[in-house]
UniProtKB/Swiss-Prot annotation:
Gene Ontology CC terms: cytosol
Protein name according to UniProt: UPF0301 protein Fphi_1754
InterPro entries (UniProt xref): AlgH-like (IPR003774)
Family named by the database record: Belongs to the UPF0301 (AlgH) family.
Species assigned in the record: Francisella philomiragia subsp. philomiragia (strain ATCC 25017 / CCUG 19701 / FSC 153 / O#319-036)
Listed HAMAP family: UPF0301
Cross-referenced PANTHER family: UNCHARACTERIZED PROTEIN YQGE, UPF0301 PROTEIN YQGE
Amino acid sequence: MFQNHKSEILLATPLIKDDAIFTKSVIYLCQNDRHGAMGLIINKPLSDTLRDVFEELEISHHNTFNEILDYPLYMGGPISPHKIMILHTTNGRNYSSTIKLDEGLAITASMDILEDLANNILPEYFLPVVGYSCWTADQLTDEIKSNDWIVTNKLSKKILFNHENKVKWQNHIEHAGYTLQSLDSLFKNIGNC
């Protein structure tokens, strides 16, 4: 039976291991319907920064704050690894390719938001990602039933957009009501069934 998880968080369980992309991933689901799902991994920073993007796209950044220039890009997933998108809070600005999500969030994949960032015009929260993750019609439902993912609707923008990436997965696990010990115990028992 289909269940819509749009605007919810997927947390990789300990059953996903030895996977360079999805082990301990935190994924914000941007879209989920009967045709499939699309989400962004939000806790896997890359070595590239917004400075690299501005230089590659020849966006003027001479007056850009250093904290913006040094902002890391995140690997959103394995699909379209060169597509740059910004997950952000809505800020009243109209960009040419914004898709509004729930909880005051949006995703934009156009040059105008990058130009705003280079000009220090910032949404309250934002996260630049390259690539995305997607699932076919029943694939995500099957993976959830197989206990690959914990789904939580307990969205905290503060946790979602913070840069403590090494503990972001753990912070989301705890925000969802689990401890690492209870999670390990639960999945050891599942593995023994």
